């Protein structure tokens, strides 16, 4: 009986996910599409949890729905009120449909080809057999930060590239109006809890669901809440420290990899005795970089003084000297 109920529940999840995806793509109201996208992200988190993938469920809820939703809602402010998606011509609609069908066929073939080429040994079994030398007891962390650490390094590079593109293209969005004191009071309670939760996710990632991406997104959520409650809080940011935090993740990753290359002749190949400590160091630096990157992405561009803080100070000094000479 319980199995039947779970089957009905899973079937409803799949049908609801397909309905949300279709409605999100077909609606012409941008605000409605963003709201449905956030709801779809939360539903995906539930589905990942049902598939016994808690790390993916946590990442989907925090990043896929939470941070991405905040970014989309912030971007909507750049559009006029009641903006809608323009009607597509039949030719454009047909091209999109053909591309979607072709992509579906290609992905289906890739999955089928991968199953046929498999030797029958599941990846989880291979990871479990090598888990004792990984430095951690969580297989997901072992794969991301040890066995396939190079992939994670490239993911951090992708995040950095995306944020640098945002900083190059735009200045920071204009501050919104002040929020009610009730929301500000709630923020004073929520932000410390989010920071503590971020630290917990970072630490627990070695042996349970969590890790740098989830912790960094949680820390960025705390900064976004502060920005929403106190629109001018970003003016107190130390821009030089923010730049350092933005690159410290990749810098630490590469530094550890080069150190391992000198000692072991292989890039990012940790010795079993040092693997746990090195993974914790890398994850701590990556958490700070991810938090800084997502916070800057939410701001929508360069904060005031980002480009030429030193030049501004020099010009102020020259102005002061000229005024003294005039007097």
What residue ranges belong to the model's regions?
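Alpha-helical transmembrane segments of multi-pass membrane proteins predominantly involved
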Residues: 1-327
């Amino acid at each position: 009986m319980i199995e039947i109920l779970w089957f009905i529940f899973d079937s409803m999840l799949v049908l609801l996910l397909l309905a949300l995806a279709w409605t999100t793509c077909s609606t012409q109201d941008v605000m409605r599409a963003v709201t449905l996208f956030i709801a779809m992200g939360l539903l995906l988190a539930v589905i990942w949890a049902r598939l016994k993938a808690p790390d993916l469920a946590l990442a989907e809820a925090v990043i896929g729905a939470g941070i991405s939703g905040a970014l989309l809602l912030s971007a909507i402010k750049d559009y006029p009120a009641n903006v809608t998606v323009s009607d597509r011509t039949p030719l454009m609609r047909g091209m999109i449909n053909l591309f979607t069908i072709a992509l579906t066929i290609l992905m289906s073939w890739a999955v089928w080809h991968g199953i046929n080429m498999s030797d029958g040994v599941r990846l989880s079994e291979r990871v479990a057999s090598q888990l004792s030398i990984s430095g951690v007891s969580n297989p997901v962390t072992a794969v991301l930060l040890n066995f396939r650490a190079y992939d994670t390094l490239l993911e951090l590079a992708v995040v950095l590239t995306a944020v640098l593109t945002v900083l190059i293209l735009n200045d920071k969005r204009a501050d919104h109006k002040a929020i009610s004191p009730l929301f500000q009071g709630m923020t004073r309670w929520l932000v410390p809890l989010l920071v503590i939760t971020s630290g917990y996710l970072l630490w627990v990632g070695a042996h349970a669901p969590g890790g740098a991406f989830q912790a960094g997104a949680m820390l960025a959520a705390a900064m976004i809440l502060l920005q929403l409650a106190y629109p001018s809080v970003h003016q107190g940011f130390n821009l030089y420290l923010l730049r350092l935090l933005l690159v410290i993740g990749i810098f630490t990753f590469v530094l550890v990899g080069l150190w391992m290359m000198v000692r072991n002749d292989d890039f990012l190949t940790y010795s079993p005795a040092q693997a746990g400590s090195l993974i914790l160091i890398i994850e701590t630096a990556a958490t700070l970089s991810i938090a800084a990157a997502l916070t800057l992405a939410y701001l929508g561009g360069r904060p005031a003084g980002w480009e030429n803080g030193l030049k501004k100070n020099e010009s102020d000094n020259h102005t002061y000297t000229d005024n003294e000479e005039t007097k």
